[in-house]
């Protein structure tokens, strides 16, 4: 399982970036969250932090 970002819902607020304990999330050049799947811990912190429900653990 890994965090997945719905690009249609992501506003680039950075809440997920701030909350990720593994530093596995960054904002791309378009301001959309991207997940480094090899670093993701599947902890759900980003999912909980996202105010737009743009991240799910799948």
Curated annotation (Swiss-Prot):
Its cofactor is [4Fe-4S] cluster. The keyword 4Fe-4S applies. Residues 2-30, 31-58 form the 4Fe-4S ferredoxin-type domain. [4Fe-4S] cluster 1 binds at residues 10, 13, 16, 50. One of its GO terms (molecular function) is 4 iron, 4 sulfur cluster binding. Disulfide bonds: none annotated. [4Fe-4S] cluster 2 binds at residues 20, 40, 43, 46. Keywords: 4Fe-4S, Electron transport, Iron, Iron-sulfur, Metal-binding, Repeat, Transport. Binds 2 [4Fe-4S] clusters. InterPro entries: 4Fe4S_Fe-S-bd, 4Fe4S_Fe_S_CS, Fe-S_Ferredoxin. Ferredoxins are iron-sulfur proteins that transfer electrons in a wide variety of metabolic reactions. This is Probable ferredoxin. It comes from Methanosarcina thermophila.
